[in-house]
Amino acid sequence: MSFLTEVETPIRNEWGCRCNGSSDPLTIAANIIGILHLTLWMLDRLFFKCIYRRFKYGLKGGPSTEGVPKSMREEYRKEQQSAVDTDDGHFVSIELE
């Protein structure tokens, strides 16, 4: 049961749960939605770099590097990785000259 649907009351020197039953369809639906929401939020926080990179580039791994020299490919890869690594914070510091 969810904390939102339970009421804890002292009963005979113990903490118990006074519930009307968990067979209420609205309660079951709310619990399922809550569990799904929590699961999706946790997966998003764990894998957000991979997930959003997939949205940006689709099913391919990134922009095509066909015909580009290997040194330029490596430089581009490092640049993209550093851009992803700096995206960990919510705020970006911009200094104006």
From Swiss-Prot:
Recorded topology in the membrane: Single-pass type III membrane protein
Modified residues (Phosphoserine): S64, S82, S93
InterPro entries xref list: Flu_M2
UniProt-listed GO biological process terms: protein complex oligomerization; symbiont genome entry into host cell via pore formation in plasma membrane; symbiont-mediated suppression of host autophagy
Positions glycosylated per UniProt: N20
Key words of the record: Disulfide bond, Glycoprotein, Host cell membrane, Host membrane, Host-virus interaction, Hydrogen ion transport, Inhibition of host autophagy by virus, Ion channel, Ion transport, Lipoprotein, Membrane, Palmitate, Phosphoprotein, Signal-anchor, Transmembrane, Transmembrane helix, Transport, Viral ion channel, Virion
Keyword Nucleotide-binding among UniProt keywords: no
Record-annotated site: Seems to be involved in pH gating: W41
Side of membrane Virion surface, spans: 1-22
Recorded superkingdom: Viruses
Main location: virion
Lipidated residue numbers (S-palmitoyl cysteine): C50
GO cellular component terms given for this protein: host cell plasma membrane; membrane; virion membrane
A Pfam family hit: Flu_M2
Region (Disordered): 59-97
Transmembrane segments: 23-43
Tagged with keyword Transport: yes
Site annotation Essential for channel activity, possibly by being protonated during channel activation, and by forming the channel gate and the selective filter: residues: H37
Compartments where located: Virion membrane; Host apical cell membrane
GO MF entry, a single one: monoatomic ion channel activity
Note from the entry: When the channel is activated, one or more imidazole moieties of His-37 probably become bi-protonated.
Role played: Forms a proton-selective ion channel that is necessary for the efficient release of the viral genome during virus entry. After attaching to the cell surface, the virion enters the cell by endocytosis. Acidification of the endosome triggers M2 ion channel activity.
Domain comment quoted from the record: Cytoplasmic tail plays an important role in virion assembly and morphogenesis.
Binding partners and assembly: Homotetramer; composed of two disulfide-linked dimers held together by non-covalent interactions. May interact with matrix protein 1.
Family under the similarity heading: Belongs to the influenza viruses matrix protein M2 family.
Descriptive protein name: Matrix protein 2
Gene behind this protein: M
